From Swiss-Prot:
It is a multi-pass membrane protein. Belongs to the major facilitator superfamily. TsgA family. It comes from Salmonella typhimurium (strain LT2 / SGSC1412 / ATCC 700720). Residues 1-10, 72-77, 122-133, 183-205, 266-272, 319-331, 382-393 are cytoplasmic. Pfam families: MFS_1 (PF07690). This is Protein TsgA. GO terms for cellular component: plasma membrane. PANTHER family: L-FUCOSE-PROTON SYMPORTER, PROTEIN TSGA. The keyword Ribosomal protein does not apply. The chain crosses the membrane at residues 11-31, 51-71, 78-98, 101-121, 134-154, 162-182, 206-226, 245-265, 273-293, 298-318, 332-352, 361-381. Keywords: Cell inner membrane, Cell membrane, Membrane, Transmembrane, Transmembrane helix. The keyword Cell inner membrane applies. The gene is tsgA.
Length: 393
């Protein structure tokens, strides 16, 4: 594989995470405007975003098989057509059913693209380089989370319709579409060259279960928290711009944290530092929820920084539970994380309707506490120390 081809594939991976991050994170910023557009209460409107998350979940789950049947390049190009149709549906359709269908299609496109992005990184890089590249790739999720809420706030403050936010997100997929030209993708399934060596199957162990629960609770907690921060902040009397700034501050700090931890993690045992980070994140989230308005920006900045490496560390630890990194194992943990994404508004919507945004934030805080417990319990059963020792690529 040529170096320019590797760079193109790596950038497709980066942008695939940016696309998913933009779609998922911008929800909290535009939810109120979309609710007004359809004359619905915000708590009811949040349920329709479950279609976006369901699309992401279904596509990540199915793409473990689809990648072996349909070439990756074909999937990405077809995804671009679906993206254009979905954004057009949001712009020109005025029914809630069409909105829900468009959100589902956006979720499908996003999930397929993200699963391809994750696969490409695990194929292109090995050993420690894989972990740091995954962390850097994941930072594009948070980079989009920093940029697109600011774009949304800018557009909405000027009374520009909410659907233009999704048109802007579509530009990310346009970049992916352009990168597919003159680019060779790894072949899979019937298109791949098969080696004669027999594949040795390994048992995953109970540590994978702990990591799967941690992944689900972490993503559900994180998105449950950040999706309702704008509504919570507005309830405290903050302006739309200030509420958007809190979300952007979180993702900016999250992004810088990922870059920092891609170096820091090399010097620590991954399970131990993951436990410390999960504990710190739970405490910082509690301080944000119970603290004064003046301290909120500082708490959300530190929360973003110290929670940034948690999810990627969970995935990396999962890949180290077997001697040979298993794509199905990594996909299983990714799927559990995506279930957390899908459940975000299923769980928090009724809580907000019944008890308000602060109750949703406290629920998210409880989920972070579960992540800490899972990471602590993992220390007694994890196989990563015996499997990661020889990996010095």
């Amino acid at each position: 594989m040529t170096n320019s081809n590797r760079i193109k594939l790596t950038w497709i991976s980066f942008l695939s995470y940016a696309l998913t991050g933009a779609l998922v994170i911008v929800t909290g910023m535009v939810m109120g405007n979309i609710a007004d557009y359809f004359h619905l209460p915000v708590s009811s409107m949040s349920n329709t975003f479950t279609f976006l998350n369901a699309g992401i979940l279904i596509s990540i789950f199915l793409n473990a098989w689809l990648m072996e049947i349909i070439p990756l390049k074909t999937q990405l190009r077809f995804g671009f057509i679906l993206m254009v149709l979905a954004v057009a549906g949001l712009m020109f359709g005025h029914s809630l059913a069409l909105f829900s269908a468009a959100m589902f299609v956006l979720g499908l496109v996003s999930g397929i693209t993200m699963s391809i992005g994750t696969f490409l990184i695990t194929q292109l890089y090995e050993g420690r380089q894989r972990g740091s590249r995954l962390l850097f790739t994941d930072s594009f999720f948070s980079m989009a989370g920093m940029i697109f809420p600011m774009v949304a706030a800018f557009l909405l403050a000027r009374s520009i319709e909410w659907y233009w936010v999704y048109a802007c997100i579509g530009l990310v997929y346009l970049a992916i579409f352009i990168l597919t030209f003159g680019c060779e993708f790894p072949a899979l399934g019937k298109h791949a060259q098969h080696s004669q060596a027999p594949v040795v199957k390994e048992k995953w162990g109970i540590g994978v279960l702990f990591l799967a629960v941690a992944a689900l609770c972490y993503i559900l907690g994180q998105l449950g928290f950040i999706s309702w921060v704008p509504e919570y902040a507005k309830g405290l009397g903050m302006s739309l711009n200030d509420a958007g700034a809190l979300v952007s501050d979180f993702w900016m700090s999250y992004m810088f944290g990922m870059w920092a931890f891609s170096f820091i993690l090399r010097f620590f045992d991954l399970q131990r530092i993951l436990t410390v980070l999960a504990g710190m994140a739970a405490v910082l989230m509690y301080l944000f929820i119970t603290g004064t308005q003046a301290h909120m920006p500082w708490f959300i900045l530190t929360l973003g920084f110290f929670s940034s490496a948690i999810y990627t560390s969970i995935i990396t630890l999962g890949s180290q539970q077997t001697k040979v990194a298993s794509p199905k194992l990594v996909n299983f943990i990714l799927t559990c994380g995506t279930i957390g994404t899908m459940l975000t508004f299923v769980v928090t919507g009724p809580i907000v309707a019944h008890s308000g945004p602060q109750a949703a934030l406290l629920t998210a805080n409880g989920l972070y506490a579960v992540v800490f417990v899972m990471c602590f319990a993992l220390g007694f059963v994890s196989r990563h120390r015996q499997h990661s020792a020889p990996a010095t690529h």
